[in-house]
């Protein structure tokens, strides 16, 4: 299963989703994408050499879909062997292990210290140069891009 993430003025990122290792995360992401939840939202947190984060309906990292899902990672008792390598997509969360909702991040560089702490659920297969371009945008002191990086749409191919 594939997610096609179209970013206004940047291009397309294709992600191969992994429902075998993160079925709850994949099902949630697919459901939100198919109902158009992500359309028009932004990548609100960008840290070059680390990751790009999006999927917040408030655009500031404090919003979500109105519910939370179980965190699928080893620190939360779930066997998810997916690593946080360059191009990995993973669910963002607060301190609570089961606090992920709609926000996700895509790794700009390998970050093994996130393994087992966050629910990785797929890998970029095309468009890593788009991730690189977004990771290079100018940001403010809160890691928010000075110019909005807008998700036009996320389409799912099954």
PLM-predicted stretches and their roles:
Residues 1-158:
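Cyclophilin-like peptidyl-prolyl cis-trans isomerases
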């Amino acid at each position: 299963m594939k997610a096609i993430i179209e970013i206004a003025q940047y291009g397309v990122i294709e992600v191969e989703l992994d429902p075998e290792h993160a079925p709850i995360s994949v099902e949630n992401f697919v459901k939100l994408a198919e109902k158009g939840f992500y359309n028009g939202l932004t990548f609100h947190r960008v840290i070059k050499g680390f990751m790009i984060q999006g999927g917040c309906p408030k655009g500031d990292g404090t919003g979500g879909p109105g519910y939370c899902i179980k965190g699928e990672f080893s620190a939360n008792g779930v066997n998810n062997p997916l690593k946080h390598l360059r191009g990995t997509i993973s669910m963002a969360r607060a301190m609570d292990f089961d606090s992920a909702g709609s926000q996700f991040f895509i790794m700009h560089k390998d970050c093994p210290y996130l393994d087992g702490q966050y629910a990785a659920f797929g890998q970029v297969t095309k468009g890593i140069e788009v991730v690189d371009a977004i990771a290079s945008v100018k940001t403010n002191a809160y890691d928010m891009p000075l110019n909005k990086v807008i998700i036009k749409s996320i389409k799912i191919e099954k």
